[in-house]
Amino acid sequence: MKVVIIGGGAAGMTAASRIKAIKPDWEVTVFEETNFVSHAPCGIPYVVEGISEADHLMYYPPEFFRKERGIDVRINAKVIEVGEGFLRVRQNGRESKYEWDKLLIATGALPKIPNVKGSELDGIVTIRHPANAEKLKRIIDEAKNIVIVGAGYIGVEMAEAVSSLGKKVTVVEFLDQPLPNLDKEIANLVKAEMEKKVDLRLGEKLEAFEGKDRVERVVTNKNSYDCDLAIVATGIRPNVELAKMLGCKLGETGAIWVDEKMQTSVENVYSAGDCVETKHMVTGKKVWIPLAPAANKMGYVAGVNISGGSLEFPGVVGTQLTKFFELEIGSTGLSEKMARSEGFEVRSTVIKAKTRVHYYPGGKDITLKVIADERGRILGAQAVGSEVAMRINVFAVMIQAGFKTKDVFFSDLAYAPPLTPIWDPIIVSARTLKF
C-alpha cells in the first residue's frame, strides 16, 4: 500500500507516524515544500524575540522520521499537480511523478495579503512558516520603525516580540478592538495593556503601502505612519488549491470538507489540519478554526482511518491562548456576541478576582467572563490576567461535556493557600450566574 501525504506539518507528520505504527509494512511518503517538518509556527514570534532558535521549532528533524519511523520524508519538494492515483513533484529543479493508493492533504494555511497599492514593495513581510523565521528575525533586527497591520493573535504576539527588541512599534487594526473574537469587556483590558507598550491605532483601514522600492510608510483611511518595515498580520486562509485540483468538495467556510473520519468527498483521499473545516461542538455548525492542537488530533484520526481503523474527530470549541508581556489572554467556546448571533438567549457575568487567598503573598489579578444560555448551559469563557491557561482549559472541558452552571458550581476543584483561592474564579462565576 502506497500512502502519500502532502504537507509535513503537525497534521501530516502525526498521520504519517500513526500509519507506520499501525501498518509498518506500508510505504508512507511525505512531501514538504520547505526544509522543516513537524514544525511549530506558533513559535515564530519567540524566535524573533530571541527566546528560541528557529531550528528548535522542529519537534524532530526529517532524518529522525526516516531512521526511527521508516517514513520517506522528501523536503524542499513542492507538489505541483495531483490527480487520481498520481501526483507530480518539483524537487531540486526536477519534476517527478509518484503514485498513491491513499492520499492525505495536509497543506495548512497561507497568510492573507491585502489587495492594496504598494503591497509588492520590499520590506513588507508576513508570518508564515518556521523555515523563514531566522530570515525574518534578521530583517526585524535591522529595522527601527515597524508597523504591524492587524491586531489578531499573530499581530499581538509580534507586537510583543518586536517591542521587546526596543523597536518603535505601531499596530494598525481595522476593528475597534484588538483580538476580535473577544467581547468588549475583555478586549478593553488587552487594549489598555497594549497601549502601554505600542502605538495602538484602532478603527483604521489599510489603504496603501508607499515607498520607492521599499516600504516607507503605511497609509490608512485616517493617518499615515512612517516605517522601514511592515509586518502584515491580517489573517490566514486555508490552502486548498491542490484539493480543488483533485475535485475535493470545499465546505461553506471555504476550507476542505471532511467527514468525522477526515475523509474528503473523493474516495481514498483524506485531509487534516489547518486546511479543513470541522464542527463546532457548541453550535453544531461547520467552522474553520485553524489551531495547532486540533491539527495534531486531526492528523492522528486521519492516520488511524487511513490504516483501516475507525476513529472520529468530534470537533472543536475554539480554545485559544496567548499573552502580551505579563498579561495572559484566553478564550474558549462562544463569545457573548457570537452566542447572540447564533440565536442563544444569553446570560453572562464578568468577575475580577485574585489567584491566591488574600493572606498569602503573590496573588495576582484575573478577570473572567463566562457566558451561558437561558437553561444555564455554559457556552463560552474568556479571561485575562494571571493563571489564565488552567481556567480556560477547565472551561473548555466543561463546555465539551455540556456543563450547566450548577455543575460548574459543584465541581470539586483543588485548593491550597499558596496556589489557589478557596473560592476559585471558576466557582464564583457559576455562583454569580445562578442556577
Predicted regions span which residues?
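Beta1-alpha1 glycine-rich phosphate/pyrophosphate-binding loop at the start
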Residues: 1-71, 160-182, 390
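Residue-level detector of alpha-helix initiation sites
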Residues: 5, 9-13, 35, 109-111, ...
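Flexible, glycine-rich terminal cap/loop adjacent to redox cofactors
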Residues: 6-10, 14-25, 33-34, 234, ...
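A Rossmann-like FAD-binding core segment of flavoenzymes
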Residues: 25-29, 68, 73-93, 98, ...
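Rossmann-like dinucleotide-binding cores of NAD(P)H-dependent redox enzymes
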Residues: 58, 145, 153-208, 291-294, ...
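Glycine-rich dinucleotide-binding loop and its adjacent helix/turn
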Residues: 105-165, 200, 258-260
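FAD-site-proximal beta/loop scaffold in flavoenzymes
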Residues: 120-143, 213-217, 224-301, 394
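A conserved FAD-binding loop/helix module that cradles the flavin
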Residues: 258, 272-335, 420-435
